[in-house]
């Protein structure tokens, strides 16, 4: 009886041991593959992260290119406006003399602002052309002198050794008095009255006194066209002031988008917590960058995507667009720039 009991106990122990072995083995395998030293990201999550990085990279690159194009167009517009402002200031400064010279030859001609501007541009173009021709002539003389000096250098090859000697003839320079006597003739003083009602003031040109009716007409034309150019200058200055305010904004947006592009992989890894979550918006990436969130890789123990998400939602729960900071106003900004440019185009007389 005792032998039978011992046999039953032994069989029970063997069966229990076999059952424990079949249960413990898979657990041992699981614990081995999931040890902290060999933890790997879920392939689905990694694929989603790579997809978001690729998609947002393309969007950021397009946005940066668009901002750079807009910034370049803004700079060209400001340069063009500044050049136009300088021209109109020059016209306004020389307007009395210009009107007087025109009306002396054509007293009955009715002058318009377009005619005056066209004449002034012709004068400036002629002066620029003369200056360019003078510069080209000076450069041509310099090159000719260099050629004459270098062409007189004689190279003599030695016959006793392999050395080559260069003989440069002595160049003597003679001081030549290049001072040009300039004879200036003092032009008679020319006075233009500031109002059209003063007919007693005399205007002279080359010693000849102009009739009072011509003086009055000249003053009237100067006053009329001068007011037009003054209004034109004020409008250009207002447009310049409006456009100049956009320069730092464009620069800041380009810097912010470039920074987001450079840090995009790290930001996406911290924001993508599930392979099945909604697509990331650029606003989420920019908020993480703007608030200096510490986003690390998921394999490190200090990552807390839930706290990041809660903080992001607390900062801006209602913001649901793809804009960052002042990017919400980018369309309004571009519209304002377009209005300023259209206003400048209307300045053409």
Swiss-Prot record:
The signal peptide, as residue positions, is 1-19
From the Swiss-Prot or TrEMBL record, state where the protein is found: Secreted
Which keywords fit this entry according to its UniProt record?
A: Coiled coil, Glycoprotein, Secreted, Signal
Residues linked to a glycan: 257
Q: Does the keyword section mention Aminoacyl-tRNA synthetase? A: no
> Has UniProt tagged this entry with the keyword Nucleotidyltransferase?
no
Q: What name is this protein filed under? A: Threonine-rich protein
* A cellular-component GO term for this protein: extracellular region
Q: Which organism is it from?
A: Lottia gigantea (Giant owl limpet)
The parts of the chain that form a coiled coil are 316-349
Q: Spell out the residue ranges making up region: Disordered.
A: 300-326
Tissue expression profile of the protein: Component of the acid-insoluble and acid-soluble organic matrix of calcified layers of the shell (at protein level).
Biased composition, Acidic residues: where in the chain? 316-326
């Amino acid at each position: 009886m005792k032998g039978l009991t011992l046999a039953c106990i032994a069989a029970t122990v063997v069966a229990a041991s076999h059952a424990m072995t079949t249960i413990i083995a898979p657990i041992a395998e699981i614990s081995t593959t999931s040890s902290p030293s060999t933890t790997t990201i879920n392939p689905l999550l990694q694929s989603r992260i790579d997809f978001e990085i690729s998609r947002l990279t393309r969007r950021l690159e397009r946005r940066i290119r668009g901002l750079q194009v807009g910034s370049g167009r803004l700079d060209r517009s400001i340069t063009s406006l500044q050049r136009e402002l300088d021209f109109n200031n020059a016209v306004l400064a020389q307007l009395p003399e210009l009107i007087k010279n025109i009306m002396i030859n054509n007293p009955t001609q009715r002058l318009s602002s377009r005619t005056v501007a066209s004449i002034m541009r012709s004068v400036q173009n002629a002066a620029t052309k003369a200056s360019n021709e003078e510069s080209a002539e000076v450069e041509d003389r310099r090159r000719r002198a260099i050629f004459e000096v270098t062409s007189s250098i004689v190279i003599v090859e030695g016959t006793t050794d392999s050395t080559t000697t260069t003989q440069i003839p002595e160049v003597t320079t003679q001081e030549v008095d290049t001072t040009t006597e300039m004879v200036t003739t003092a032009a008679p003083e020319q006075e233009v009255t500031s109002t059209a009602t003063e007919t007693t003031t005399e205007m002279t040109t080359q010693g000849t006194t102009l009739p009072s009716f011509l003086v009055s007409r000249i003053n009237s034309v100067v006053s009329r066209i001068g007011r037009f150019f003054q209004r034109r200058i004020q409008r250009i200055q207002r447009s310049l002031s409006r456009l100049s305010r956009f320069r730092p904004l464009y620069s800041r947006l380009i810097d912010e988008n470039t920074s987001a592009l450079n840090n995009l992989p790290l930001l996406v890894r911290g924001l993508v917590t599930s392979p099945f979550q909604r697509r990331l918006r650029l606003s989420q990436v920019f908020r993480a960058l703007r608030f200096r969130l510490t986003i690390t890789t998921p394999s490190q123990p200090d990552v807390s995507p839930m706290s990041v998400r809660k903080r992001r939602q607390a900062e801006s729960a209602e913001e649901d667009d793809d804009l960052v900071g002042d990017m919400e106003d980018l369309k309004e900004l571009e519209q304002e720039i377009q209005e300023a440019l259209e206003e400048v185009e209307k300045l053409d007389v």
